[in-house]
A protein has these predicted regions:
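Exposed beta-sheet edge/beta-hairpin loop segments within beta-rich domains
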Residues: 80, 188-191
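A generic structural signal for short beta-strands and their flanking turns/coil linkers
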Residues: 38, 45, 131-133, 216-218
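Catalytic core of non-heme Fe(II) oxygenases with the double-stranded beta-helix
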Residues: 73, 87-91, 99, 112-189, ...
């Protein structure tokens, strides 16, 4: 938590005002967002700026998330993300050559923490074959009031519905033919205590409601993909050649 607080303290909000929203997807047109795969960048909640573009709330209470390469660029997050216990867990789950590709601090701020619509992580971290896996760490208690995760048990067996990728220089959602809508009537909430790790198959649909409570619901997330799978060049999340993906098991790039 101290590392998160330090990052926020050092962040100068005057330098960027990119909003992250899964409902409006306004961030998709932002170069700041598009090029964040190998950087540490800050994204705001909606409705935290006035008509002049000034923050209406303290920056620590206005951020939606920090991403997407904390695990490789910040020593505290790096030490946690490449911990041998996570490598052993990945081995127990038979993850093939897991490579850390994304990390995020998700704040889910009190009162203004936005809804995250139903989605599958493989939509954004597409590989052939599918290999994305999510590690979701509850940094605070997550409950129905402050926007806990909801999932659709077993739905990961029904394939990928959508892909978020670059088309003619723009980021777009592409629907797969014959994709069926999610049966959200079967949704199950995941209320968990601080310190809980939730593992998410990349094809498992999940969602969280807006946080209308007085309590934040902060989480740290990691995502891996297989180093043996194809990671297409038109995926939205890309890295420069000077920062290849590192093995969760060894921390090495080979």
């Amino acid at each position: 938590q101290q590392a998160i607080d330090d990052l926020v303290d050092q962040f100068e909000p005057e330098s960027v005002k990119t909003v992250f929203s899964t409902t409006s997807q306004s961030h998709a047109a932002s170069e700041y967002f598009e090029s964040s795969g190998d950087k540490i960048r800050f994204f705001f909640e909606e409705a935290v700026f006035d008509e002049c573009g000034d923050l209406t709330t303290p920056k620590a209470e206005a951020l939606n998330k920090i991403g997407h390469a904390l695990h490789d660029l910040h020593p505290v997050f790096e030490s946690f993300s490449y911990h041998p216990r996570l490598a052993r867990l990945a081995e127990q789950l038979d993850l093939e050559d897991p490579r850390l590709i994304q990390s995020m601090v998700i704040f889910k701020q009190p009162k203004i923490g936005g809804e995250v619509i139903w989605h599958q992580d493989s939509t954004f971290l597409y590989t052939e074959p599918m290999s994305a896996t999510g590690f979701w760490f509850a940094l605070e208690d997550a409950n129905l009031q402050n926007g806990c995760l909801w999932v659709l048990p077993g739905e990961h067996h029904n394939g990928l519905r959508q892909r978020f990728c670059r088309v003619d220089g723009q980021l777009k959602n592409l629907d797969f033919p014959d994709a069926l809508p999610f049966d959200v009537a079967r949704a199950v909430p995941l209320e968990v205590s601080r310190g809980t790790l939730v593992m998410l198959n990349g094809l498992l649909p999940h969602y969280s409601k807006a946080n209308v409570s007085d309590q934040s619901r902060c989480a740290y997330t990691l995502h891996t993909v297989s180093g043996k799978a194809l990671y297409p060049a038109d995926n939205w999340l890309q890295r420069g050649p000077d920062m290849p993906l590192r093995s969760l098991s060894t921390g090495a790039t080979e």
